[in-house]
Swiss-Prot record:
Comp. bias (Acidic residues): 681-694
Biased composition (Low complexity): 628-662
Role: Cross-links actin filaments (F-actin). Stabilizes and prevents F-actin depolymerization mediated by profilin. May regulate actin cytoarchitecture, cell cycle, cell division, cell elongation and cytoplasmic tractus.
Any single Gene Ontology cellular-component annotation: cytoskeleton
Cellular localisation: Cytoplasm, Cytoskeleton
Organism: Arabidopsis thaliana (Mouse-ear cress)
All residue ranges annotated as the Calponin-homology (CH) domain in the record: 124-241, 269-372, 393-499, 514-622
Subunit description: Interacts with F-actin.
Protein's name in the database: Fimbrin-3
Gene Ontology terms describing biological process: actin filament bundle assembly; actin filament network formation
Region feature (Actin-binding 1): 124-372
Length: 714
């Protein structure tokens, strides 16, 4: 059960100020420092803390050194600092960084920022709106209705999220069908493993719908940490509210395209910009002289709301609204008008006047859904006739979600548009191959000069060639011009390399050779075979994969408890294949795999996505062996710092997935040790005929060499 402990500190206040992801990161830095010189002093800290993301943008190493020099009354320069003192120093610097960035900012809502998942101050108004949203959309849920409605003024929300069911259900409300609800553990009382599985499923599924969860771990959700819970819920509600703001889902939006505007330019707009464009379209109709450019200050006087509602619902219009002299009075009249239109309140009049960005966005989105006022005549036939390459759309979605999951500073709304200046690609390349980018030669957005964009993209192509990507006749200008085929080709090679790099990082004891497709296939076949299952594949194009049975066998082989065979079909008809595929995606995420494919990719045997899914399962399985091996060899270090025994590489997901106990109740290291053990397989391949001998070296990949030989012979 050690996987649930996390990094524990004795001071409750310290524990509450940092997420488990932050604690693990800081703990690893502290342990590394201590291992270097035997102790950690103030003088050691500047060179380490300047590399921490939350501080690097605010301070240089020299500035940190000066700040730490001012702590002399609390610490001597040569004092041996313990971990908690180290954390206090970090928090001191973090507060100063926040003050330097602008003290007023840390109390304002940051939920509108795409990459935000951490908010250390709780906005009670926003929390109340989230609770009302949950009561409204999940009140009739067969499982949750026994716990709903929640009281907005209580802490019931934080208690209810602790078993993971509510968040999983909320993801399906935001993007229907994301989670196969058969994979959710919904007993009234869940054990710690079952709760952890739900949280792991939640976080991996949240990433798969576009949420940023880089600062959230399963332990944070299990504890119901308010700022993280609200940060995740706000992203899910925002995704739900903005889901229809695209031409693909609502062709009527083409009416917003102005005569001098390119349809392609409109397609590139993020949903928030489309919503503002829609609002200004109607305001112009109603004679409003200003242009609304944000969901905060431009709406504080409620005049824009009054004009908007008068255009959309003139039958409920009250002339006194525009004549009101007091902003608060006008805001109240606007809300009364909205209620007559059947728009439930997301905010109060005070919150309109205060300029709450998130609540205003939610309110405008609700008005849009209730009555968008757009034409339903032939004007939008062009949007309906637009032909889209379905596979291109799927690929763009997959790479967009993958990039956003990496934790880079930028956020991608549209791959083809957002990568054209080269900056995001440089950020991604640096994640895959740290240190490969020459940032001194890179230009950060906004970039006005076209040649600077070309320079960025040229560096991307140069690094790609150094990584041995297939980039024949590809130049940086091809990316700047938005060549979709070349962009998708580059991103596929980057995503594949990233996954193989993760696998390679676990092969250090076999001289770090590059992993090949054939080795991944051999590993998967062997894993299934040693468990006595009959399914095998020859390649990632094997048509038998469409039934889903091989992946279910593989998932069961790496962790038997995650697959409920009573829910599995024979995979013969199209409907049965889709049921299995949907279940596979959710089970893989529940296990701890960060995957972005769709069930259709399995049914149609999309070779690229099949490779990534198989490699993700392999990585998870081998990572558990690595964690077990490292925890046994470094238990003394772990006990001295109260660190979790489960380690995570810098590029792994932040879901803290812990290996569930196997069917036999034993740890996979001893009972299902396909990677660690030397296996003798009798001819009948039955489980009872397996002889497993312990490998004294506990090498997590001791059988990779034999797999490589098998692959070569094949």
């Amino acid at each position: 059960m050690s996987g649930f402990v996390g990094v524990i500190v004795s001071d409750p206040w310290l524990q509450s100020q940092l997420t488990q992801v932050e604690l693990r990161s800081l703990n690893s830095k502290f342990v590394a420092l201590k291992n270097q010189s035997g102790k950690v002093t103030l003088e050691d800290l500047p060179s380490v803390l300047v590399k921490v993301k939350s501080l690097s943008s605010s301070f240089k190493e020299k500035e940190i050194k000066e700040i730490l020099g001012g702590l002399g009354s609390d610490y001597e320069s040569d004092d041996d600092l313990d971990f908690e003192s180290f954390l206090k120093v970090y928090l001191n610097l973090r507060d100063k960084a926040a003050d330097k960035a602008g003290g007023g900012l840390k109390h304002s809502s940051s939920f509108l920022k795409a990459g935000t998942t951490t908010l250390h101050t709780i906005n009670q108004s926003e929390k109340g709106s989230f609770v009302l949203h949950i009561n409204r959309y999940l009140g009739d849920d067969p499982f949750l209705k026994q716990f709903l409605p929640l009281d907005p003024d209580s802490n019931d929300l934080y208690e209810l999220v602790k078993d993971g069911v509510l968040l999983c259900k909320l993801i399906n409300i935001a993007v229907p069908g994301t989670i196969d609800e058969r994979a959710i553990n919904t007993k009234r009382v869940l054990n710690p493993w079952e709760r952890n599985e739900n949280h792991t499923l939640c976080l991996n599924s949240a990433k798969a719908v576009g949420c940023s969860v880089v600062n959230i771990g399963t332990q944070d959700l299990a504890e119901g940490r308010p700022h993280l819970v609200l940060g995740l819920i706000s992203q899910l509600i925002k995704i739900q509210l903005l889901a229809d703001l695209s031409l693909k889902k609502m062709p009527q939006l083409v009416e917003l395209v102005e005569d001098n505007e390119d349809i392609e330019e409109f397609l590139r707009l993020p949903p928030e910009k489309v919503l503002l464009k829609w609002m200004n379209f109607h305001l112009k109709k109603g004679g409003y002289k200003k242009t609304v450019g944000n969901f905060s200050s431009d709406l504080k006087d409620a005049q824009a709301y009054a004009y908007l509602l008068n255009v959309l619902a003139p039958e409920h219009c009250d002339p006194a609204t525009l004549n009101a002299e007091d902003d608060l009075e006008r805001a109240n009249m606007v809300l009364e008008h909205a209620e007559r239109m059947n728009c439930k309140r997301y905010l109060t009049a005070e919150e309109i006047v205060e300029g709450s960005s998130y609540l205003n966005l939610a309110f405008v989105a609700q008005i849009f859904h209730e009555r968008n006022g757009l034409s339903t005549d032939g004007r939008f036939s062009f949007a309906e006739m637009m032909t889209e390459d379905l596979q291109t759309c799927r690929d763009e979605r997959c790479y967009r979600l993958w990039i956003n999951s990496l934790g880079i500073e930028s956020y991608v709304n549209n791959v083809f548009e957002d990568v054209r200046n080269g900056w995001i690609l440089l950020e991604v390349v640096d994640k895959v191959y740290p240190g490969s980018v020459n940032w001194k030669q890179a230009s950060k957005p906004p970039i006005k000069m076209p040649f600077r964009k070309v320079e960025n993209c040229n560096q991307v192509v140069k690094i790609g060639k150094e990584m041995r990507f297939s980039l024949v006749n590809v130049a940086g200008n091809d990316i700047v011009q938005g060549n979709k085929k070349l962009i998708l080709g580059f991103l596929w090679q980057l995503m594949r390399t990233h996954m193989l790099q993760l696998l390679k990082s676990l092969r250090s004891r076999t001289r770090g050779k590059d992993m090949t497709d054939s080795e991944i296939i051999s590993w998967a076949n062997r894993k299934v075979r040693i468990m006595g299952r009959k399914s095998q594949i020859e390649s990632f194009k094997d048509k038998s994969l469409s039934s889903g049975l091989f992946f279910l066998d593989l998932l069961w082989a790496v962790e038997p408890r995650v697959v409920n065979w009573n829910l599995v079909t024979k995979g013969e008809s199209d409907d049965e294949k889709r049921l299995n595929a949907t279940y596979i995606v959710s089970v893989a995420r529940k296990l701890g795999c960060s995957v972005f494919l769709l069930p259709e990719d399995i049914v149609e045997v999309n070779q690229k996505m099949i490779l990534i899914l198989t490699a993700s399962i392999m990585y998870w399985s081998l990572q558990q062996q690595s964690s077990s091996s490292e925890s046994s060899s470094s238990s003394s270090d772990s006990s001295s710092t109260h660190s979790t025994t489960t380690t995570c590489t810098s590029t792994c997901t932040s879901t803290d997935a812990s290996p569930a106990p196997s069917v036999t109740g034993e740890d996979e290291v001893s009972s299902l040790n396909g990677e660690v053990s030397s296996l003798t397989i009798e001819e009948d391949n039955e489980v009872s005929s397996l002889t497993i001998e312990e490998d004294n070296d506990a090498d997590i990949l001791s059988d990779i060499t034999s797999i490589s030989e098998e692959a070569a012979n094949e």
